Amino acid sequence: MKKLLLAIAFVAFVFSVSAQNVQLHYDFGEGRKMLTSTVEMFKPDKYGSTFFFVDMDYGADGTGIDNGISLAYWEIARAFKWNETQKFMPRVEYNGGTMSIGDGIWIPIENCWLAGIERTWASADFSKILTLQANYKNIKDKLEGGTKNQNGFQLTAVWVIQMLEGKLTFTGFADFWKEEMFWGTDYRFLSEPQLWYNASKNFAIGGEVELSNNFVGDEFAVKPTLGLKWTF
């Protein structure tokens, strides 16, 4: 789960309010069968906006962990503005975490720094929103046995579509980036479209489908979830 607040964040930005939500998903993906929690926050101010999320997995096949956290990962980003009519916003971002691979072994999700620019489009009633980002990406100690940083790029799209007078929300993101992997690929793709039925202003029932290529391994994978979401 990631970046799933960024699209609705534009609405929050327009009206200068913050937004937060908590999600809990059960993952049906092969070899997973686990719970994942996501905490997200978006907060605008007169100089731009701050966004972060924290993902945690609670056990999974192959991690050797049945009672506890098997993965922790977070991203934090800051976008900058200097006037109210600004269309393009410079941005910086940090990603990092750690995960269990079994037998008591934990490996880092390498520190990653991104810098780039973003642009958002919205319909007149803000029921349809699209944000596109283009970033330079630096992954620390990724190459040559952990002694050399890797430089690349990342392209991101984030969207939200409100349907049935706001009772149904289709949202998600797609990332495409360059990263050399030990299984021989250089490019990776990850998308997590979500569909939510908004039972009330705060509570939603739905889920997501994780679509990835060269993300966990040298393959295309589809991993569905069922989820609950509470928006503060």
Kindly label every feature range from the protein language model.
Residues 221-232:
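Outer-membrane beta-barrel "beta-signal"
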Residues 4-15:
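Sec-dependent N-terminal signal peptides
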Residues 19-62:
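Short glycine/proline- and aromatic-enriched beta-strand/turn motifs that initiate or cap beta-hairpins
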Residues 21-27, 33, 60, 64-157, ...:
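Outer-membrane pore/translocation modules
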Residues 135-203, 210-214, 230-232:
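Outer-membrane beta-barrel transmembrane domain signature
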Residues 47-52, 83-90, 123-130, 161-170, ...:
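Repeated loop/turn-to-beta-strand initiation elements of outer-membrane beta-barrel proteins
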Residues 42-44, 77-81, 118-122, 158-162, ...:
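Transmembrane beta-barrel domains of outer membrane proteins
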